[in-house]
Amino acid sequence: TNKDDFFEIKRHQNKTTVTAYRIKKGVKSDVFFKKTYSKLTTKEIWIYGLDDDDCFEVTGQGTDFIKVRLVGGQNKDTYNVQNGKKVVVYDFKTKENEFVTKRGLRKLTDNYETNVYDYKKLKYNSNLLIPSFGSNPDDGFKIGLININTKNHFERNPFSAQHKFSAFYYFATNGFDMSYTGEFANIIGQTNLHINSKFTSPNYAVNFFGFGNETPNLEIDNNEISLDYNRVKLRTILINPSIQWRGHLGSSVRFGVSYESIKIEKSLNRFIDSVVDDTKNLTNDFLGALIAYSYKNRDDNAFPTLGLETTIELGYKSNIKTSKSFSYLKPSVALDHKISSNGQLVLASKFLGHLNFGDNFEFYQAATVGANSGLRGYRNERFTGNNSFVQSTDFRINIRKLKTSLLPLDIGL
């Protein structure tokens, strides 16, 4: 409550009894809460003192206890922890508190979201499984699966942990790719650990037509040349750990390092044969570092009528074998704004850029423009160069919202 309270936590083997008293004239008096929790049905007990001066007393002998988290909240609180096993104390670092013993784990922080009770705080985990399929000339028919698993424990930023796994198979090349992104909250203070990894099979392909804006697409004018002519098979292994700071309004800053191994799979009678003719150049390993800033704020993820998303990434990569290195900058901005009062019609614009500094990069690290980067009507990676810039604008119409027993749907153009 927002008054002076005394919390008595008696711990027994496989069960814990919590009794809450009102403090009157400096001593505990009326009982306003009492309950015994069984370890068979309870994983953790969270006790919030809220405002005013509160006292927490933890007693009991044994080892197999329910984990207890004590959250003092505002004002001066007193903690008398006689048995600190599986006891965690949270309170404000800059406020005065009294600790009678040194037992238990203390986590003193001025993080408001941790120390203040929020009845909306989710107490369950979630798992989202998304099937994906599509078709285009470069990939052929493709099928895939995306799984997002979110853990919501006590300490969050904005969740305790999140795991994203995706896998796609491409029928045109018989290639596949897999990626994993993990984020773990508050590894050091309010800093998250971010892990990004990717693997592509030896048959996974990208396109390369040469450097410049006037490179020909011979497949259009010559029926004897297939789409395979400009395909390059790349086996990729990427590991990118980083630390991430998250802001309260949708911003984040990430700093990390990376290791990347890329192998070109030799294929006969393709354009790449004229570019890479030395078997020593087929495999390259890179070490890198990056710093990235992102901001995202939208009123709706499915059909935003008002939103802003921007990212900027500055990085450096060095070839381990040749010691050649280069740096790059990748900025992007996306804007969404409704142009009708009811939000059914939305104007959406996106700006993408890629700048490489120096010439010591491989062709698959160059800036590209194509169907997979906003240039509609062209093949993926249609144009390649040192730098690139793409701007696209959409008019979006939200025709109808449907609520079904399986999934909510937004139908639009």
Show where each model-derived region lies.
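Detector for repetitive beta-architecture
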Residues: 4-6, 44, 53-55, 65-67, ...
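Transmembrane beta-strands of outer-membrane beta-barrel proteins
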Residues: 132-134, 146, 162-168, 194-200, ...
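Acidic/polar low-complexity surface segments
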Residues: 15-41
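C-terminal outer-membrane beta-barrel translocator/porin domains of Gram-negative envelope proteins
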Residues: 179, 208-209, 223-229, 278-282, ...
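Outer-membrane beta-barrel initiation region
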Residues: 46-48, 58-60, 71, 78-208, ...
